[in-house]
């Protein structure tokens, strides 16, 4: 009798274990059905943090403009955030390709290799021209030189001209200051002025426009180049002659195209913008946004 009771207990325990096993097995199967096995698509910062915040990164030339637009936009739209940082056009474009920002700001067009990298990453860059700008060649106010031809400027930056007396100045060595290679201004200057030549190897590079301003303002022998919007009384802007006479970097000459170092400024988005990104770009392109571009020292597109 005792043996029969033990048998019943064992059978009951086996049944319980089987039932529990089926329950756990069913739970596991349900989890497998819910997991599709695909890697989630890379999201932009705004998709991760919510649609009330967007991130811009890139050109130091575009930085003051973008900051002013962001401040005005957020003042008019409480609860919405627009974060703007610099670092250079190349840095911003890389961030867009990597899905880290909503807008890349740039003072040059994207390169073919950047477009290819974007395609590989599933990013579809769309270009938006938001303003125009000019590049000023600057010297220390103590420097008597007031203008340069493009040939002279090319010689200074490729190293074939190394003394200010060679361009009508005093007998002093020329100290050339340049942006680093991540800068769109660096690329534009190389294409338009150096025409394929390399920068002289002893050129001092700066990661930001402010560094060029500081160096030139403190060194009577220095020469540099910056966006017109950054000009202040600590430096002197030179007139440039590209073959049609000496031209100053004035607003009239830049907007008319007479000044030889004029260029467009860009926003790049992943595909056609939507949501808060579209709202912000629409604001920048509105009458109020374009008026603000003029106030900051740039030149509107409309």
Model-found features: residue ranges?
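Exported/periplasmic ABC-transporter solute-binding proteins
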Residues: 2-14, 18-302
């Amino acid at each position: 009798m005792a043996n029969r009771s033990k048998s019943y207990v064992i059978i009951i325990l086996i049944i319980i274990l089987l039932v529990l096993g089926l329950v756990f097995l069913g739970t596991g199967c349900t989890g497998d059905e819910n997991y599709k096995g695909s890697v989630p698509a890379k999201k932009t910062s705004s998709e991760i943090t919510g649609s009330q915040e967007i991130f811009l990164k890139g050109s130091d030339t575009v930085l003051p403009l973008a900051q002013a637009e962001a401040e005005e936009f957020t003042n008019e739209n409480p609860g919405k955030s627009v974060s703007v940082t610099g670092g250079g056009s190349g840095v911003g474009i890389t961030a867009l390709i990597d899905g880290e920002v909503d807008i890349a700001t740039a003072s040059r067009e994207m390169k073919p290799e950047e477009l290819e990298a974007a395609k590989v990453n599933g990013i579809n860059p769309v270009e938006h021209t938001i303003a125009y700008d000019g590049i000023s060649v600057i010297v220390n106010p103590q420097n008597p030189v007031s203008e340069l031809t493009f040939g002279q400027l090319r010689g200074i930056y490729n190293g074939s001209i190394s003394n200010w007396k060679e361009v009508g100045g005093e007998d002093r060595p020329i100290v050339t200051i340049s942006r680093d290679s991540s800068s769109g201004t660096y690329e534009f200057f190389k294409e338009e002025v150096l025409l394929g030549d390399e920068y002289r190897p002893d050129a001092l590079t700066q990661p930001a426009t402010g560094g060029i301003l500081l160096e030139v303002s403190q060194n009577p022998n220095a020469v540099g180049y910056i966006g017109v919007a950054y000009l202040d009384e600590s430096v002197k802007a030179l007139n440039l002659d590209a073959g049609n006479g000496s031209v100053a970097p004035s607003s009239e000459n830049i907007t008319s195209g007479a000044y030889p170092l004029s260029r467009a400024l860009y926003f790049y988005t992943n595909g056609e913008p939507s949501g808060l990104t579209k709202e912000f770009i629409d604001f920048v392109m509105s009458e109020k946004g374009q008026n603000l571009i003029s106030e900051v020292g740039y030149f509107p597109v409309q």
